Amino acid sequence: MSSQSHPDGLSGRDQPVELLNPPRVNHMPSSVDVSTALPLQVAPTSVPMDLRLDHQFPMPVTEPTLREQQLQQELLALKQKQQIQRQILIAEFQRQHEQLSRQHEAQLHEHIKQQEMLAMKHQQELLEHQRKLEQHRQEQELEKQHREQKLQQLKNKEKGKESAVASTEVKMKLQEFVLNKKKALAHRNLNHCISSDPRFWYGKTQHSSLDQSSPPQSGVSGTYNHPVLGMYDSKDDFPLRKTASEPNLKLRSRLKQKVAERRSSPLLRRKDGPVVTALKKRPLDVTDSACNSAPGSGPSSPNNSSNNISAENGITGSVTSIQAETSLAHRLVNREGSVTQLPLYTSPSLPNITLGLPATGPSSGGSAQQDAERLAIPALQQRISLFPGTHLTPYLSTTTLERDGGTAHNPLLQHMVLLEQPTAQTPLVTGLPLHAQSLVGGERVSPSIHKLRQHRPLGRTQSAPLPQNAQALQQLVIQQQHQQFLEKHKQQFQQQQLHINKIISKPNEPARQHESHPEETEEELREHQALLEEPYSDRVSSQKEVPGLANMVQVKQEPIESDEEEAEPQQELESGQRQAEQELLFRQQALLLEQQRIHQLRNYQASLEAAGMPVSFGGHRPLSRAQSSPASATFPMSVQEPPTKPRFTTGLVYDTLMLKHQCTCGNTNSHPEHAGRIQSIWSRLQETGLRGKCECIRGRKATLEELQTVHSEAHTLLYGTNPLNRQKLDSKKLLGSLTSMFVRLPCGGVGVDSDTIWNEVHSSGAARLAVGCVIELVFKVATGELKNGFAVVRPPGHHAEESTPMGFCYFNSVAIAAKLLQQRLNVSKILIVDWDVHHGNGTQQAFYNDPNVLYISLHRYDDGNFFPGSGAPDEVGTGAGVGFNVNMAFTGGLDPPMGDTEYLTAFRTVVMPIANEFAPDVVLVSSGFDAVEGHPTPLGGYNLSAKCFGYLTKQLMGLAGGRVVLALEGGHDLTAICDASEACVSALLGNELDPLPEKVLQQRANANAVHSMEKVIEIHSKYWHSLQRYASTVGYSLVEAQKCENEEAETVTAMASLSVGVKPAEKRPDDEPMEEEPPL
């Protein structure tokens, strides 16, 4: 049927309606015609019926559209919701950002305010200091003017007043002096301190123009009356003397001077002006007393009669000018301007108590002055040697600057002395009297006299143990600083005793040239050159014992000439009285000295007992004890044995001078790298007994030439010199001014950055000593004198680059030692392992293109976000050195931190395979312990145990025939570094190590460590083929790796046994026919 449209709007496909079309309606009866209207009524109802019952085609057309519209509406709603949420988040972020910005700005303002307050406080302190200095200077000026006025009044006095005749005041003073002399001497024996008030020295000297030439009214020798160091009050001043203006006094004084110059006994020289100079009679103050020593100047040392007489008669008796605020040796200047030495050998490893002060003019009686000063210095040295905790140098060096510098450097010297006083002078002065003549026996003094400019006996090994009482010496001292001083003191004291016996037997023996030891640097030889310029025979003309004092003191005596008969009988009587009184005084003070020595030894014994150490002095002879008789030869005979060689064991090197490298602020809490680090390690090694099993060697300062093997000349000169010897350098060699290289730290000190502090006096010496100690130890191990070694040194060095100090480091000790091994010993292969938690950027820079030095560093890297930022795994070297720079750089932060498992795995899979393939001749270790548990995040953050480092050390000992040297680098937690050092030294000694915990053996390395190791193996496997074998075992635990290696070893063994078993079976059938061939 066709689907035609109809007027009623129905389509032809509507079959029910199609039956009622009009043509058919016309043939129907009329009675039914009414039904024609039915379609009109039925049609409206039929349409919904069709939709409901038959066809539903219109619905699929309308529903997708609606759903699409609904989906679009929902999408729009979601987008609007997301937009709203995004706007809310942005608004919240902006709000928080603004809040943080405000907080940060407030913190900045607060920080700036604090800095301003600190700056203002510092400025106020400076102003206050300047005000005090100005006030002090004004007081000095007033005192000086007052003295000049007094002097001018005396010069301009009327002719009618008395001039040459002693006044009533003078007579009263003389009488008071005689009555109080004995009381003053006894008082001076019991009081051993110096007044810090400079006016204390000026009390009774304003009348010096009236008290210069009268003979003394007491019979006490002037050479002993006035100690160089001791209690010095107004009553102890030189006796007031009459001026030498009358002819009879002039004649008498000149006669006395002539006799005194030729008199045999120095005890009779009371009035010998040129012999006893102002320096000798002046007390050694540590405060300022700057003045000239012209006759009548008052505040300077009281001049004796001969000086004034010589000046008045046209003979210039120049007296040395003494600058303000100078230390001990500045007062002990001889006639050439050089400084008198202490009798010990010149060791660069002990602190210097003085910097020397040049004299302004020659003194007319220099030889006798030197003689008395030489007797004074041993007395000081032997008294000081009993004081614990006092860091004293065994020598007073004389430099070219001191001889030729004149007064131009005096302000610099004063500045150096001011910097030195808080640590050196205070313990030195307290309780130590120093007399113009020695208080000990001749045998104890004479070695010091002759030792000053004689060479040391050849053939002594500096690191050798003492021939006698070495163990007793170690038990005697519990404080390591004082113990080291006593050990060195004992070695040199024995040698001096041996040497002085030869000198005594040959008093007129000509001088011999100074022999330098290998440890002495060229700088030290230059410092001692001044002492060599004057012949020894000029200083020691003859030796003769003084009757009655042979067992007390030995002094230089001049030949007796016939002119001695010109002396008046009265002088002889006075001399005898003075000699008897002098002898009595000597005995009293010798007894006092012995009592003090016994008191010190008892203190040591008590400290040893408190520490639980055995106390056994037995036959040990105290180092500072004098021989009781010149004829005693038992002690010198014992040191004639040849020095023993060092034991072939682990070597240790340490020096207390490195303790002086510390910030001037004095607060160690704000400076992680402080002196307590190495002091604690040394104490731990001593407490555990490890130090006694090792061989302790003597360190030295590295020379400037040695430093320049790694560092630039400007860097070496800037950080390897102190202000005193820096003045001798060419200013053009120093790049820029010194002040531009340092900054003021928040603590008030000075440094090159916030971490690397600088002490103008001690830092250069400590840094050079650290390098020299490492060099000495490395060379002794490399040459086979020692088995291995551990250097307890500071400051560290592996961050120091060619021209840049950083990270607490100034000179790269390990790199310098490696360079010198190549240059001096032609060592072809050197392995440097750096297990400090920070990358050794300085060491890497020094050998980045050297194929003969393999540098392996294990450090925290964190993609360059941990100090110093270098040490990426792809930094493999350059040029010929490609592949010889291995950075085992751990990345991943502290989630979780690296521990024993990770480091042991790195050693097993990276370090040891490469090291074995390299096959080094010497192994050097930059042994930083800041990866040990206990260090804060900025300084490490890892959780290694101390015993782990013992196992790492033990593995390295399998290389290079055991020639392994560890040098301390970082590590700032005292407990951690002490434990780790103990573990390493124990491993070096070959002791059985404590087993690792089972957890460490079973645990696998964390994912970050595995990824870091795989990356290193991937980079370096093309340079080191042995890494490929361990690439698959990085994820194994130690137990699993050991099991795998055992299985491989068993497999190899089985294969080898199979190959060995087949060969005999094949040979026997071959052999048997050959034996049977002849019968056939």
UniProtKB/Swiss-Prot annotation:
GO terms for biological process: B cell activation; B cell differentiation; chromatin organization; epigenetic regulation of gene expression; inflammatory response; negative regulation of DNA-templated transcription; negative regulation of striated muscle tissue development; negative regulation of transcription by RNA polymerase II. Zn(2+) binds at residues 663, 665, 671, 747. Residues 132-162, 233-244, 258-273, 509-527 have a biased composition (Basic and acidic residues). Gene3D superfamilies: 6.10.250.1550, Histone deacetylase domain. InterPro entries: HDAC4/5/7/9 (IPR046949), His_deacetylse (IPR000286), His_deacetylse_dom (IPR023801), His_deacetylse_dom_sf (IPR037138), Hist_deacetylase_Gln_rich_N (IPR024643), Ureohydrolase_dom_sf (IPR023696). The keyword Cell membrane does not apply. Its main location: nucleus. A motif (PxLPxI/L) lies at residues 348-353. It is an enzyme of class 3 (hydrolase). Keywords: Chromatin regulator, Hydrolase, Metal-binding, Nucleus, Repressor, Transcription, Transcription regulation, Zinc. One of its GO terms (cellular component) is histone deacetylase complex. Residues 205-224, 625-637 have a biased composition (Polar residues). Residues 1-25, 132-165, 205-312, 506-527, 558-579, 622-646, 1055-1080 are annotated as: Disordered. GO terms for molecular function: DNA-binding transcription factor binding; histone deacetylase activity; histone deacetylase activity, hydrolytic mechanism; metal ion binding. It holds the Pfam family HDAC4_Gln. Residues 289-312 have a biased composition (Low complexity). CDD domains: ClassIIa_HDAC4_Gln-rich-N (cd10162), HDAC4 (cd10006). The active site is at 799. It is found in: Nucleus. PANTHER family: HISTONE DEACETYLASE, HISTONE DEACETYLASE 9-RELATED. Belongs to the histone deacetylase family. HD type 2 subfamily. Responsible for the deacetylation of lysine residues on the N-terminal part of the core histones (H2A, H2B, H3 and H4). Histone deacetylation gives a tag for epigenetic repression and plays an important role in transcriptional regulation, cell cycle progression and developmental events. Histone deacetylases act via the formation of large multiprotein complexes. This is Histone deacetylase 4.
